[in-house]
Design a protein with these regions (language model features):
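Mixed-charge, low-complexity intrinsically disordered regions
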Residues: 1-64, 68-125
Length: 125
């Protein structure tokens, strides 16, 4: 089977447009999510070499990305290297933790220092 999974970044049209623009410009080369979401959704953790269709707010594929590195770390241990690759905020791990704790809380997820986070680095094909 040659089907690829889809990936949607951001939870509003405006935020998704912003994040997708960063991906297409080569400034966003990573994304993160809570490991428990994969369990809740019955989805496997992303794996190196896996391809994803990047969707816009209408659900239309705008690019294909491939996972180049996948790590699972405690929220408190997300490194600056990842924050830089993610391309958001001031590009520091401290800003990553602050902004993502707020963003995820808005979606009902209260992140803790030991919450397991999947870090996926990727490139656009």
């Amino acid at each position: 089977m040659n089907e690829i999974r889809t990936i949607e970044l951001g939870n509003t049209r405006e935020f998704r447009d912003e994040l997708n623009s960063l991906v297409l410009a080569g400034k966003k080369r990573a994304t993160a999510g809570a490991l428990e979401w994969d369990y809740e959704e019955g989805e496997p953790v992303e794996r190196v070499g896996e391809k994803f269709a990047l969707l816009d707010y209408k659900g239309k594929a705008i690019a294909t990305i491939v996972a180049t590195r996948v790590e699972i770390v405690d929220f408190i241990d997300v490194p600056d290297e990842f924050a830089l690759a993610e391309g958001e905020g001031d590009l520091s791990a401290e800003d990553f933790r602050k902004s993502h704790a707020k963003y995820w809380a808005e979606d009902g997820f209260k992140v803790k220092d030991d919450s397991l986070i999947v870090l996926m680095y990727f490139e656009v094909l």
